[in-house]
Amino acid sequence: MQPYQRLLALGFLLLTLPWGQTSEFQDSDLLQFLGLEKAPSPHRFQPVPRVLRKIIRAREAAAASGASQDLCYVKELGVRGNLLQLLPDQGFFLNTQKPFQDGSCLQKVLYFNLSAIKEKAKLTMAQLTLDLGPRSYYNLRPELVVALSVVQDRGVWGRSHPKVGRLLFLRSVPGPQGQLQFNLQGALKDWSSNRLKNLDLHLEILVKEDRYSRVTVQPENPCDRLLRSLHASLLVVTLNPKHCHPSSRKRRAAISVPKGFCRNFCHRHQLFINFQDLGWHKWVIAPKGFMANYCHGECPFSMTTYLNSSNYAFMQALMHMADPKVPKAVCVPTKLSPISMLYQDSDKNVILRHYEDMVVDECGCG
């Protein structure tokens, strides 16, 4: 069943069922077009990066204006991809009771669950974001050094010190505020070849003291500030080329419909899918719903040239006149457009995904 057919069935379901009786269908086949086995049940929404909100707003605006867009290319990031996943850090701090030992401000194991990434997907981007905290009016000191390494052996989860391996990045930072981005696509080569289920990194932030930082009064201890405000996330962009095929079916050019056009003839009808009616508003961040539409109406032979019909529909109408056993041409979508959805799954991953053929734009006989 095509995605728009599932949504059409869902729309009629919402129209015919009494209010409040749609929740039992959340775990049905209707969720499969999202790639979900069941409806997620997050306790609360994770913070959504500005870039993801910018992407979803731009795509909604393009869809509303009818502008063409390649949803398998993420213009804001400059990469190919039709699935964006924001994976939260699920790691833990080390030695939080003894800061400033040998200049070390804090150490943390960053842990990212990669099981949400599909095996057949092609990795096109992996960007780690470290948020050191909100920017301040103060010229925060001291200067910091951020060291990011691969964890070879995690040891006992949350209790033992991990075995640190290859150094990935060593970067100086003016102060404990703002965001840092790191390209981890090279570090995820092992995932691409071995399909690893997780990524473990060792983060250490060191204080680079100088004479200025020792004499300047700071509003608070920089290490205390980092321990309280440090936040890490991994943005992964993947591409499944099978979901990026342009439609190759050619149709006869539509002829202007004459005045007095009968509303019983094949045409597009409006159908709005409201996610709140389904209970999906609990995990779908944006949009709140969308106009899916559907096709309905008759396809009489005398009107096939006016109903955006395919060549095959025209021939089928002729064959039906000669032999009534041949089925009539039926009203079907002739042009479909995609949508993008931003949602959160049960593992707290924020996902921006592109879905082909979700909105009926035009109808015709076929």
UniProtKB/Swiss-Prot annotation:
Synthesized as large precursor molecule that undergo proteolytic cleavage, releasing the pro-domain from the active, receptor binding, C-terminal region of the molecule. Its main location: secreted. It comes from the Eukaryota. Disulfide bonds join C266-C331, C295-C363, C299-C365. Glycans are attached at N113, N308. Primarily in adult bone marrow, spleen, thymus and adipose tissue. It is found in: Secreted; Cytoplasm. Pfam families: TGF_beta, TGFb_propeptide. Disruption phenotype: Embryonic lethality in one-third of the mutant embryos because of pregastrulation developmental malformations. However, the majority of mutants survive until adulthood without any overt abnormality. Mutant mice shown resistance to diet-induced obesity. One of its GO terms (molecular function) is protein kinase binding. GO terms for biological process: endoderm development; eye development; formation of anatomical boundary; in utero embryonic development; mesoderm development; negative regulation of BMP signaling pathway; negative regulation of epidermal cell differentiation; negative regulation of myoblast differentiation. In contrast to other members of this family, cannot be disulfide-linked due to an atypical cysteine knot configuration, where the fourth cysteine is missing. This fourth cysteine is involved in an inter-molecular bridge to stabilize the active form of homodimeric or heterodimeric signaling molecules. Belongs to the TGF-beta family. Growth factor involved in early embryonic development and adipose-tissue homeostasis. During embryogenesis controls formation of anterior visceral endoderm and mesoderm and the establishment of anterior-posterior identity through a receptor complex comprising the receptor ACVR1B and the coreceptor CRIPTO. Regulates adipose-tissue homeostasis and energy balance under nutrient overload in part by signaling through the receptor complex based on ACVR1C and CRIPTO. This is Growth/differentiation factor 3. It comes from Mus musculus.
